[in-house]
From Swiss-Prot:
This is UDP-N-acetylmuramate--L-alanine ligase. Pathway: Cell wall biogenesis; peptidoglycan biosynthesis. Signal peptide: none annotated. The gene is murC. Belongs to the MurCDEF family. Cell wall formation. One of its GO terms (biological process) is cell wall organization. ATP binds at G127, T128, H129, G130, K131, T132, T133. PANTHER family: UDP-N-ACETYLMURAMATE--L-ALANINE LIGASE (PTHR43445:SF3), UDP-N-ACETYLMURAMATE--L-ALANINE LIGASE-RELATED (PTHR43445).
């Protein structure tokens, strides 16, 4: 099936005469889905494999891409010219091994992303948290301005219906990946740094100073005519500012920011705030996305848009029309309790991808600010043994701030278990730390039973995590 996003184009690192079919191992991954869409749009035959369905997989299936479920050497044949992997794919993956036996080149996804960006005006969004939403907001502005950008995002932008699209315009907006240092291979003109926090520390040899050095190196790669947009509220970003040798635009709630957020107010999911710009201009922003963290994401995208000459009216219209990103504080609906436990009333369900303590904290604060009259019930699935181990105490503190906590076992994401690090031990630590009494749901089949007993009218049910948690809980509500 030919993609409706087809544009005449050629990826320079792939010879179109010899290359017809490209296979993605782990095609449903955050960084893989979008690239598959872009290459499909350029006329390549795309296939892929993954272990389970998710929103990304479903969007690819709608485009006619053939996807195998499960990783097997039989998925790879000699008709495939290139196999694409990410850092999440083990070298011993049967498809990778079969490709090597058949002498099929195996390349990392970032090689394709960097080559695509090299031929356009690249805008790379980097940082530990907030990248996906910032890409979504900035893309929304560019589309509203009629600039038809190419974009690659880590989540489906609801207003666009996809996570990536090949545009006719000159601009390329991309989410970059610091988890494996692959963002150092990108060649943007503009770089946004939302924050720098402890995550993926195995990549950085458990050395936070090294992580900071890599971010500085990323900014040093900007051309002399390029610029960096950075969040000055973040203490680590503020610390490295003197070492950035490019034009800098700062944003945040801090009074010394180039774009300063003031008069922030939130009611339910809507937030209002003013952005003061150092040339004495003011922008009154209305955003249909809650949370201080999303005001910061909006300020980052607004900073780029202003610098690129996009009109204020376009920016503000785009902000007020912004409908969000899948699994980023996604409002799934108000569901009658009788579909779960036969009781009278409704429960509001929100789905969120956040899996780092800082992200959980931001989401909880947004809920407490906008829905202080609701009981907060969280179903949380920890993501990765290494992250849970490295940030254990932070998880204990932030998870202790909800009213009711149900915890599934850790989603490994392919990692080997770490002795003593599991959901049960995390629940035990939370119980010792706070009044909340966490419930460890050892088998996801029992989740419905627990929810039947716990949920009551006006509860806010928060589905939290980056693993399979969203699919599990959606099945309880949406498919019933």
């Amino acid at each position: 099936m030919q993609s409706s996003y087809f544009k005449n184009g050629i990826l320079p690192i792939i010879n179109r005469f010899y290359t017809k079919q490209i296979h993605f191992v782990g095609i449903g991954g955050i960084g893989m889905c979008g690239l598959a869409m872009l290459l499909l749009a350029q006329g390549y035959c795309i296939t892929g494999s993954d272990i389970a369905q998710n929103d990304m997989i479903r969007s690819l299936l709608k485009l006619g891409i053939k996807i195998f479920f499960g990783h097997r050497d039989s998925n790879i044949n000699q008709e495939i010219n290139i196999v694409v992997i990410s850092s999440a794919i083990d070298i011993n993956n049967p498809e990778v091994q079969q490709a090597k036996r058949l002498k099929i080149p195996v390349i990392h996804r970032v090689k394709i992303l960097s080559e695509l960006m090299r031929y356009k005006y690249g805008i790379a969004i980097a940082g530990t948290h907030g990248k996906t939403t910032t890409v979504s907001m900035l893309t929304n502005i560019y589309v509203e301005a009629g600039l038809d950008p190419t974009f690659v995002n880590g989540g489906i932008i609801r207003s666009q219906g996809v996570s990536a699209r090949l545009g006719y315009g000159n601009d390329f907006i991309a989410e970059s990946d610091e988890s494996d240092k692959s963002f150092l291979r990108l060649c943007p003109v503009v770089a946004v740094i939302t924050n720098i926090d402890t995550d993926h520390m195995n990549t950085y040899h458990q050395n936070f100073e090294y992580l900071q050095e890599v971010f500085i190196k990323f900014l040093d790669k900007l051309p002399m005519y390029g610029y960096a947009v950075v969040c000055i509220d973040d203490p680590v970003v503020r610390k490295i500012l003197p070492r950035i040798n490019r034009k800098i635009i700062t944003y945040g709630f801090s009074k010394d920011a180039t774009l300063c957020i003031v008069k922030y107010y939130q009611y339910r999911e809507k937030s209002n705030f003013t952005i003061l710009i150092k040339n004495n201009k003011e922008l009154q922003v209305v955003l249909n996305t809650p949370g201080y963290h999303n005001a910061l994401n909006a300020a980052a995208s607004i900073a780029v848009a202003i610098e690129e000459g996009i009109r204020d009216t376009v920016i503000l219209k785009s902000m007020s029309n912004f409908t969000g990103t899948n699994r980023r504080f996604e409002f799934l609906g108000n569901y009658p309790l009788n579909i779960i436990n036969g009781r009278v009333g409704k429960v509001m369900v929100i789905d969120d991808y956040g899996h780092h303590p800082a992200e959980l904290r931001s989401t909880i604060i947004a809920i407490r600010t906008g829905w202080s009259d609701h009981r907060l019930v969280m179903v949380f699935q920890p993501h990765r043994f290494t992250r849970t181990h490295e940030l254990y105490d932070n998880f204990v503190r932030v998870l202790s701030t909800v009213d009711v906590l149900l915890m599934l076992d850790i989603y490994s994401a392919g990692e080997q278990p770490i002795m003593g690090i599991n959901a049960q031990s995390l629940c035990d630590s939370i119980l010792k730390y706070a009044k909340v009494q966490p419930i460890f749901v050892q088998n996801e089949c029992f989740l419905l039973k627990f929810l039947m007993n716990l949920l009551r009218d006006k509860d806010l049910l928060l589905i939290q995590g980056a693993g399979t948690i969203s699919e599990i809980v959606k099945a309880l509500f949406i498919k019933r």
